[in-house]
Amino acid sequence: MKFKQDFFTQLPEFYSQVYPQGITKPEWLAWSDDAAQLIGLSQPTDELLLGLSGNTAVDGATYYAQVYSGHQFGGYTPRLGDGRSIILGEAIGPNGVWDVALKGGGPTPYSRRGDGRAVMRSAVREFLVSEALHHLHVPTTRALAVIGSDLPVWRESQETAAITVRLARSHIRFGHFEFFCHSERGRADKLIQLLNFTITQHYPHLSCDAAGYKAWFLQVVQDTAKMIAHWQAVGFAHGVMNTDNMSILGDSFDFGPFAFLDTFQEDFICNHSDPEGRYAFGQQPGVGLWNLQRLAQALTPVIPSDDLIAILNQYQEALVQPYLRLMRAKLGLSAVDVPSVEQDKQDLDLIGRFTVLMEKNQLDYTQTWRQLGKLDPTSKHSALRDDFIDVSQFDTWYQAYQLRLGAVADIPAWQTERNSVNPKYILRNYLAQEAIIAVEEGNLAPLHLLQKILTQPFAEHADHEDLAKRPPDWGQGLIMSCSS
């Protein structure tokens, strides 16, 4: 790997230098060839294993943990920071630059009495969801590898430590800006320094002046809205949408007790630590706006409040348009050449009525969409009909759907197109859990198979139909904790 160290050299007050503590008996548990290509790597090697497990130095790496703050479950925490993630620097790849971080690399000045470690189960889950989201075309950070060990760590019980090697276009979060506005009061100079760095590194087409700052914030609003639109379309619940877990670039970031929907449930909660459902699936669009409002508050020393409010008022449209584009594709509806408020309203109503029917009839979200690939949209009798208990309500919806759909000249091509946008496979929590149990027993094959399937989620994989099934009774509605 070839590194540059722009964050390290230009923002010395934004981090603490800290070196990883190696894990014992490191081994490759998983590796992403796809992610490796981003930073110019090919195959995992013994030398790389020692470096990324923290046992030897990686040439060109500087090692540091960033400081930031954030709103967690609605309350402001003035000092957070990378408690168990150590960044090596910015790796220069053939087509871009990626931060390389060791998540679980050991304690840092921001560990808050924690051990700085990640357990194997959380490392495997982060790796798998990074692969899954990327191949579902959802903006996300990536994971290069999972490195296991025999190092014992204690959570609710004794587990083993592991490291996720994360790749991110940037590790700058909403919380970085909050820290230098609220926690370090009177440091508007640092806020401006961070803002200028972010624009120069990631938005080079913008200027570092008043006009550029406003254009940048609008881009952040649009990118955040687009990310959440993707989440809602694929049925992904993040689970911990604190502002310190929000990437400034609109990439899905910091995965903990996430889940993909099994049975469609608007108020689905995937986080055991969120009993009131602040971060429930259906709340995510609203939380996205709330988090952007917190970012806007932090930017008031730099951008006038009236301008910030005007930009925030564009969030809803920035969310709805990509959501409509994604959902129209899932349904096979023709794109709208000329934007129409009335057509958008009608399509949102059609989509909403369909998901309400899914919830009322307790249907699997992913499987129901996939069934469209078997549908003859010109037939009066839908193959979907038998899945619904209330067939009269379905018939009413289906008639409206056919009317909006219009004529379909090539039915096989239409069906193929539906299968290209409606995945057959998602990372169901029970599948991740089965892979984790197998790893604990020394069997990596289920993990590697699941990774392979998740990199081709739209393919049939006829030999692995079992991985597309609804969860068994024990796997229904698995809720994870933040313990990792």
Curated annotation (Swiss-Prot):
Keyword terms, alphabetized: ATP-binding, Magnesium, Manganese, Metal-binding, Nucleotide-binding, Nucleotidyltransferase, Transferase
Binding residues for ATP: G81, G83, R84, K103, D115, G116, R166, R173, D254
InterPro entries: SelO
EC number: 2.7.7.-, 2.7.7.108
Residues the record lists as binding Mg(2+): N245, D254
Cofactors required: Mg(2+); Mn(2+)
Entry annotated with the keyword ATP-binding: yes
Keyword Glycoprotein in annotation: no
Top-level class of the enzyme under EC nomenclature: transferase
Catalytic reaction annotation: L-seryl-[protein] + ATP = 3-O-(5'-adenylyl)-L-seryl-[protein] + diphosphate; L-threonyl-[protein] + ATP = 3-O-(5'-adenylyl)-L-threonyl-[protein] + diphosphate; L-tyrosyl-[protein] + ATP = O-(5'-adenylyl)-L-tyrosyl-[protein] + diphosphate; L-histidyl-[protein] + UTP = N(tele)-(5'-uridylyl)-L-histidyl-[protein] + diphosphate
Superkingdom to which the source organism belongs: Bacteria
Database matches in Pfam families: SelO
GO molecular function: AMPylase activity; ATP binding; magnesium ion binding
Catalytic site positions: D244 (proton acceptor)
Sequence similarity: Belongs to the SELO family.
Function: Nucleotidyltransferase involved in the post-translational modification of proteins. It can catalyze the addition of adenosine monophosphate (AMP) or uridine monophosphate (UMP) to a protein, resulting in modifications known as AMPylation and UMPylation.
UniProt name for this protein: Protein nucleotidyltransferase YdiU
Native source species: Shewanella baltica (strain OS195)
